């Protein structure tokens, strides 16, 4: 097994928390109360797990790079190396949305069919759920690794699909997915830093780090590029937290009762995850949905009310962006929703109405749509 990197430095993270508290008053208000008060108010872990993400991505890239030989062997043994096999990305809830952020880019990079499949569907409809073929690779994602569907689905596949190979990506070193299969040569377990195993209800660090860990499958022959991209993403992620937190806090004070998140391609997976986060963090008080920019016209627009927040993850690709801008302008022309929040780079100012908000993210387009999902879900 690959050598495990040292644990992410708590001192490094605390220095960052201090810096962001000093520079951004919104975070100062949250970080400054005594830890016991933060815990009583229920946000102690969530706050840190959101803010630490840019640094955890750097650690995850180093950690995954140590598994290079094992990952190359796994791709070869599963038939993906010579394009005979298929790739399935599985999990439940947010862990499934990890796969939805990755399937298109991994399919393009590996030149094999790649499908996100819910772990529960594998349990109930095994033969229909999996791509046809005798061999393939199944990647199982799990923050805790203890959900009954995840381990049960893996147990089932080990019995019924004996030629398949498996990759487990998990944040919990003591969970079932991390400990139960160590003796099986068909399974490689990649453990992320314990700091990514979110203690709060919602998945934040765990989600983005599992996305970024598995992104390496498509860049395993070019790890220098993988590390360079990680550095760019970490810098943009820090800038989002430093530059836009006041604006986002102001949005949160709006009295919206529902929210819809729009994304294209890989960003639709980010939209799904973001919608779930809003639903969970408001305890269901804000109803949420996610759609593609082109799909929202076909029925879901009827659910956009005067009290609906519309969040748009804008593509950096010219053709994709043209379709997205057309839809956003239609929303403005029809005066739909309470307000729009548009996240992107070089966003045209004519898109917005009074009350709308543009979150400019320099270098976002350079990171690429296929990698920006970790930024959209911060």
Regions found by a protein language model. Give the residues of each.
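Glycine-rich phosphate-binding loops that contact phosphosugars or nucleotide phosphates
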Residues: 4-12, 80-232, 313-364
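Extended, charge-enriched "interface" segments that sit outside catalytic cores
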Residues: 4-26, 32-33, 46
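Peripheral docking tails and interdomain loops at the edges
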Residues: 7, 15-19, 356-378
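Acidic, two-metal ion nucleic-acid-processing modules in DNA metabolism proteins
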Residues: 36
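Conserved phosphate/anionic-ligand binding catalytic regions in large, soluble enzymes, centered on
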Residues: 42-46, 52, 89, 93-105, ...
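Active-site phosphate/pyrophosphate-binding segments
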Residues: 49-55, 60-77, 82-83, 181-311
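Short conserved micro-motifs at the rims of enzyme active sites and ligand-binding pockets
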Residues: 273, 322-324, 353, 369-372
